[in-house]
């Protein structure tokens, strides 16, 4: 299991660096070749991925009886789609959007209740309920969800913050995210080696997420006073400690599940991380637009225009009004960074209370 930790560190470094490198490459491609290039570049990457997958060595495992779970799949889809649409409706903070948002939330709750009931009865459930009853596994999966929420919302909204609030170009925004990518890769590799040597697991995300939470508080309250170099250094530091999580989560659930359910356990981590990323980004966007609309509806419209057309094509306003709108947008991003800090704080407590502390 300890050697597995080292290789999980490699995998986590590659996977998370790929996630954070996307905005870096996207900014440069948009600046040089236009926004269409960020979609076209995925074609050769997908073909390369398919080729590498085809060349993987085959590994035969013991076959187990399996039955599809179409009811679980439908209920899960209804739950996720309705809840995300409800969060999107709440971003408008308009009275005419509230009935639809409330109805979608209610539909999501009903679908969730029915989903839990279905998964406890299905012979081959979409969601491995039996595994999730184990404290070490459900806490690790919840930690993966919090990590996904914090990381993906960060790499989604930091580029917007840099361009809209600080006036950076897409290319310079991409370059400012390079330290975050380097930090995450380095943190994942170092954590994998430390777990392999010491056998300790949760101590690393406990310490790492505490530091990340402090970093997010610095971004929330003092980012406007940071120069470009200081901000790049903060993102490097932030990434270094964000890299302490995913490798530990994977090796923890694999150790807790046993060899027969190793695949289910590993899949549950990626599943949880993806769900956390989707919901986390939607929640942060809801907080951002809610605060902005509450402070200044005109600023919300201006921000939406900046998001759609770019900073240079926003509405022409007197300098004093532009400064006021910029201040309101900066305040909304403060709330967004605090929402991200809430995710990392929850992850900190999940890691702290995980019963599997050594492997």
Where are these regions (language model features)?
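Membrane-interface helix caps of multi-pass small-molecule transporters
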Residues: 24, 28, 32, 55, ...
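Hydrophobic alpha-helical interface/terminus motif in multipass membrane transporters
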Residues: 29, 56-57, 86-87, 119, ...
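A membrane-interface helix-boundary motif in multi-pass transporters
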Residues: 31-41, 89-100, 169, 290-341
């Amino acid at each position: 299991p300890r050697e597995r930790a080292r290789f999980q560190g490699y995998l986590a470094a590659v996977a998370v660096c790929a996630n954070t490198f996307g905005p870096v490459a996207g900014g440069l491609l948009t600046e040089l070749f236009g926004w269409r290039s960020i979609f076209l570049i995925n074609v050769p990457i997908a073909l390369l991925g398919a080729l590498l997958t085809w060349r993987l060595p085959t590994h035969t495992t013991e076959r187990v009886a399996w039955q599809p779970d179409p009811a679980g799949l439908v209920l899960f889809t209804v739950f996720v789609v309705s809840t995300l649409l409800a969060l999107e409706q709440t971003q408008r903070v308009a009275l005419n959007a509230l009935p639809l948002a409330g109805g979608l939330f209610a539909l999501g709750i009903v679908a969730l209740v029915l989903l839990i009931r279905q998964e406890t009865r299905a012979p081959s459930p979409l969601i491995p309920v039996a595994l999730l009853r184990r404290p070490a596994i459900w806490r690790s999966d919840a930690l993966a969800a919090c990590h996904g929420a914090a990381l993906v919302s960060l790499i989604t909204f930091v580029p917007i913050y840099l361009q809209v609030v600080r006036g950076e170009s897409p290319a310079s925004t991409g370059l400012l995210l390079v330290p975050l990518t380097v930090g995450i890769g380095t943190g994942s590799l170092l954590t994998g080696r430390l777990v392999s040597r010491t056998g300790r697991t949760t101590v690393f995300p406990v310490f790492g997420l505490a530091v990340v939470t402090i970093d997010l508080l610095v971004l929330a309250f003092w980012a406007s006073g940071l120069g470009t170099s200081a901000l790049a250094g903060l993102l490097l530091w932030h990434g270094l400690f964000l890299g302490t999580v995913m490798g530990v989560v994977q090796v923890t659930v694999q150790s807790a599940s046993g060899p027969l359910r190793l695949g289910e356990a590993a899949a549950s981590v990626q599943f949880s991380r993806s769900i956390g990323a989707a919901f986390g980004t939607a929640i942060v966007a809801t907080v951002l637009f809610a605060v902005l609309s509450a402070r200044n509806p005109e600023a919300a419209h201006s921000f939406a225009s900046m998001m759609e057309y770019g900073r240079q094509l926003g509405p022409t306003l007197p300098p004093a009004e532009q400064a006021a709108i910029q201040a309101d947008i900066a305040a909304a991003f403060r709330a967004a960074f605090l929402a991200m800090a809430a995710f990392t704080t929850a992850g900190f407590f999940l890691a702290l209370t995980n019963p599997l502390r050594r492997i």
